[in-house]
């Protein structure tokens, strides 16, 4: 039963933390520029042909990459928002850990 209480506190703490404005989250898109140029040369397939039409087909693909950064600031959920939120008693990741360990000690 103790394990379930701890897991419950962890889940609830993370939910409160996520909605209270603490921390920073960001994600970066994969850079696809290394596949922007695909070249296909059909030079070796014309050995038995007597024509001089050697086709050089070049396909160029331009990929636009973007970087998005999302930052959560301010706000909070009821009383816990003031504790875990920005400029609260427990601010940032260290504040989240302090709140989690404190809740565990209370169980």
From Swiss-Prot:
The keyword Lipid metabolism does not apply. GO terms for cellular component: plasma membrane; side of membrane. Glycans are attached at residues 53, 56. It is a lipid-anchor; GPI-anchor. Disruption phenotype: Leads to strong defects in host cell damage in a model of human oral epithelial cells, increased survival of infected mice, and aberrant filamentous morphology. Residues 26-56 are annotated as: Disordered. Transmembrane segments: none annotated. Residues 77-107 form a propeptide. Residues 33-56 have a biased composition (Low complexity). A lipid is attached at residue 76 (GPI-anchor amidated glycine). It is found in: Cell membrane. Residues 1-18 form the signal peptide. It comes from the Eukaryota. Keywords: Cell membrane, Glycoprotein, GPI-anchor, Lipoprotein, Membrane, Signal, Virulence. Cell surface GPI-anchored protein required for virulence. Mediates hyphal ramification which is important for the interaction with host cells. This is Virulence factor PGA16. It comes from Candida albicans (strain SC5314 / ATCC MYA-2876) (Yeast). The lineage of its organism: Eukaryota, Fungi, Dikarya, Ascomycota, Saccharomycotina. The gene is PGA16.
